[in-house]
Amino acid sequence: MKVSVVITLAVLGVMFVWASAAELEERGSDQRDSPAWIKSMERIFQSEERECTKFLGGCSEDSECCPHLGCKDVLYYCAWDGTFGK
């Protein structure tokens, strides 16, 4: 009885190690492919240029902000400049 329990536990242990190794091999191939995917997505987002920086967006001067927004001097973000109109 004890021998059959030990054999069963040993077989389960071997199966667990085998399944874990297969999973790590799959996950490893995903990780090797992901940097190229991330770089391609980075290129896509960098190619899009916005016309102006929207409300609370980062800026360095007023001309970067959308109409009726100005660049704040302290934290350098676009905020309403107090004007109305189209």
Curated annotation (Swiss-Prot):
The keyword Membrane belongs to this UniProt entry's keyword annotation: no
Protein name: Mu-theraphotoxin-Cg2a 2
Places the protein is found: Secreted
Source species, domain of life: Eukaryota
Molecular functions per Gene Ontology: ion channel inhibitor activity; toxin activity
Species in which this protein is naturally found: Chilobrachys guangxiensis (Chinese earth tiger tarantula)
Pfam families according to UniProt: Toxin_12
Lineage: Eukaryota, Metazoa, Ecdysozoa, Arthropoda, Chelicerata
Keywords: Amidation, Disulfide bond, Ion channel impairing toxin, Knottin, Secreted, Signal, Toxin
Main localization (coarse): secreted
InterPro entries named among the record's database cross-references: Huwentoxin-1
Similarity field: Belongs to the neurotoxin 10 (Hwtx-1) family. 37 (Jztx-31) subfamily.
Role this protein plays: Inhibits both peak current and fast inactivation of voltage-gated sodium channels (Nav) channels. Inhibits the inactivation of Nav on DRG neurons (EC(50)=1.77 uM) and peak current of cardiac myocytes (IC(50)=0.90 uM).
Signal peptide limits: 1-21
Tissue: Expressed by the venom gland.
Phenylalanine amide sites (modified residues): 84
